[in-house]
């Protein structure tokens, strides 16, 4: 199987997001890379599921709370940006202040 660089990045993001989700489910507070991966992978899947850009942006702000991440991480994450694949093409999605 041959994957393009973009496909490899998406796969790595998915794997990192899955690892972060498992840790969150066990009650482990997420560090910075896990937090970004968790949010980004959920945004990718929401886009593939057919949500609009606006819906994905709103959804991204509901995924994590301050209690889900290590101390100081919420203050470090001002925005998360991804290029997501929607039914009508690839679009840039930005979620401002995703941890509330």
UniProtKB/Swiss-Prot annotation:
Q: In which pathway does it act?
A: Nitrogen metabolism; urea degradation; CO(2) and NH(3) from urea (urease route): step 1/1
Instruction: Point out the signal peptide segment.
Output: none
Q: Where in the cell is it found?
A: Cytoplasm
Q: Does the keyword Cytoplasm apply?
A: yes
Matching SUPFAM superfamilies: Urease, gamma-subunit
Broad class of where this protein is predominantly found: cytoplasm
Keyword terms, alphabetized = Cytoplasm, Hydrolase
What GO CC terms are in its UniProt record? Answer: cytoplasm
Q: Which GO terms of the molecular function aspect are on file?
A: nickel cation binding; urease activity
Q: What class of enzyme is it?
A: hydrolase
Q: Which BP terms in the Gene Ontology apply to this protein? A: urea catabolic process
Q: Does the keyword rRNA-binding apply?
A: no
Matching InterPro entries, A to Z?
A: Urease_gamma (IPR012010), Urease_gamma/gamma-beta_su (IPR002026), Urease_gamma_sf (IPR036463), Urease_subunit (IPR050069)
Name the cystine pairs: none
Quote the catalytic activity from the record: urea + 2 H2O + H(+) = hydrogencarbonate + 2 NH4(+)
What EC numbers are recorded for this enzyme? Answer: 3.5.1.5
Superkingdom of the organism of origin: Bacteria
Q: How does it assemble?
A: Heterotrimer of UreA (gamma), UreB (beta) and UreC (alpha) subunits. Three heterotrimers associate to form the active enzyme.
- Family, per entry: Belongs to the urease gamma subunit family.
Q: What is this protein called?
A: Urease subunit gamma
What is the originating organism of this protein? Haemophilus influenzae (strain 86-028NP)
Q: What gene name does this entry carry?
A: ureA
């Amino acid at each position: 199987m041959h994957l393009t660089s973009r496909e490899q990045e998406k796969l790595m993001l998915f794997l990192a997001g899955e690892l972060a989700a498992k840790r969150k489910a066990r009650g482990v507070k997420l560090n910075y890379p896990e937090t970004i991966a968790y949010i980004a992978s959920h945004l990718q899947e929401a886009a593939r599921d057919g949500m609009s850009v606006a819906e994905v942006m709103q959804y991204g702000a509901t995924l994590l709370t301050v209690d889900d991440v290590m101390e100081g991480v919420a203050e470090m994450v001002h925005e998360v940006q991804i290029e997501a694949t929607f039914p009508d093409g690839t679009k840039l999605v930005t979620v401002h202040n995703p941890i509330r």
